[in-house]
């Protein structure tokens, strides 16, 4: 066997996709059943991730801080019974939620560098926080649950600053 008989085949990276969802569980999301709507939307988004064999993670923020509730993993048994205990109330520590998500995305980037990482932020934007866009988020989507007569437009402001997509829940459900 000689050197010309050896062949090197470069394989395309198979990093997959991670969808990191950040759910606003603050008191303002309880009004108008926004949190219930957000939970229903999350169930649908997790079902899509599961069907696509994509990984998902869920960070919830409200009250005094944020915590990782699921993942990152391929959601297999995601259903309403798992999400029902996620309650709401208190302040809107958006920066804490984004910081927690940034840690999830950073760990994912180290573990699977070729993975495409999506950050979804489901909030009404009723926070004075102006967090910076997480460095390891390849794509960012804001889902704006603000429905007040006088809108603050903070989701739009952050989406514009981050170069992110902005949707209402109705646009994603339709």
Where are these predicted regions, by residue range?
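VWA/integrin I-like adhesion module and closely mimicked acidic/polar interface patches used
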Residues: 125-170
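Von Willebrand factor
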Residues: 66, 76-117, 126, 144-153
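Short acidic, Gly/Ser-rich segments with clustered Asp/Glu that frequently serve as metal-coordination loops
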Residues: 25-36, 126-130
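An active-site-proximal "capping" alpha-helix that borders the catalytic cofactor pocket
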Residues: 36-52, 57-58
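Short beta-strand/turn micro-motifs composed of small residues
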Residues: 23, 60-62, 121-123, 144-146
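Short beta-strand-loop
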Residues: 55-85, 130-133
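Structural motif
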Residues: 18-20, 116-120
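Acidic, polar low-complexity linker/tail segments
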Residues: 1-20, 28-34, 51-52
């Amino acid at each position: 066997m000689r050197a010309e008989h050896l062949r090197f085949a470069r394989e395309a990276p198979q990093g997959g996709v991670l969808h990191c969802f950040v759910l606003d569980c603050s008191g303002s999301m309880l009004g108008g059943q926004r949190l219930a709507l957000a939970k229903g939307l999350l169930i649908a988004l997790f079902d899509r991730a599961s069907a696509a064999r994509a990984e998902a993670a869920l960070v919830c923020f409200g009250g005094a801080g944020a915590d990782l509730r699921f993942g990152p993993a391929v959601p297999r048994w995601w259903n309403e019974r798992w999400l029902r205990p996620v309650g709401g109330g208190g302040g809107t520590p958006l920066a804490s939620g984004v910081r927690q998500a940034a840690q999830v995305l950073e760990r994912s980037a180290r573990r699977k560098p070729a993975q495409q990482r999506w950050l979804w932020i489901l909030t009404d934007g009723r926070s004075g926080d102006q967090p910076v866009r997480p460095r390891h988020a390849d794509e960012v989507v804001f889902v704006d649950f603000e429905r007040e007569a006088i809108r603050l437009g903070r989701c739009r402001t952050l989406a514009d600053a981050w170069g992110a997509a902005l949707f209402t829940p109705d646009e994603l459900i339709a």
